[in-house]
Amino acid sequence: MTEVAGRPGTSGGLALRAGQFVFAAASICAMASAPGFTNYTAFCYLVASMGLQALWSLGLGCLDYYALTLRRDLQQALLMSLFVVGDCVTAILSFAAACSAAGVVVLFERDAYLCRRDPQLPCGRFEVAAAFAFLCWTFSAASALVMSWLLASL
């Protein structure tokens, strides 16, 4: 049971963390390049959530790299408990932020037609940021699932 792909201290775990970080950073960059995103709460929440996700995944990615370099085992009950809680919290926050941002984008484009009426509104960038947030969430959810599975098998 302990040989699950993506467990901490392995190259699979490092790849999951790298994917989380890359897509969170891409979402932040896409949103930050959109002028006026601070006028909408859902987009500010997306940036805050992706910032937290990027910091969490960067920290655990560094820990995975350290464990890989020194061949350390990170499967200890206390560490796994912290990983599970952190991964579950960041996965839930990422999903909520991605859904809220995507909901506002749908409102702008399909319901209120604000994107057609106001060509200055960067709807395409909002869409890209929400899409990257969903991709970040998929990596985060996979990591949370792996960590929960590993904690249950200890």
Curated annotation (Swiss-Prot):
Residues 39-42, 109-130 are extracellular. Residues 1-17, 64-87, 152-154 are cytoplasmic. It is a multi-pass membrane protein. The keyword Electron transport does not apply. One of its GO terms (cellular component) is plasma membrane. It is found in: Cell membrane. InterPro entries: CASP_dom (IPR006702), CASPL-5 (IPR045009). Glycans are attached at residue 39. Keywords: Cell membrane, Glycoprotein, Membrane, Transmembrane, Transmembrane helix. Its main location: membrane. The chain crosses the membrane at residues 18-38, 43-63, 88-108, 131-151. Homodimer and heterodimers. Belongs to the Casparian strip membrane proteins (CASP) family. This is CASP-like protein 5B1.
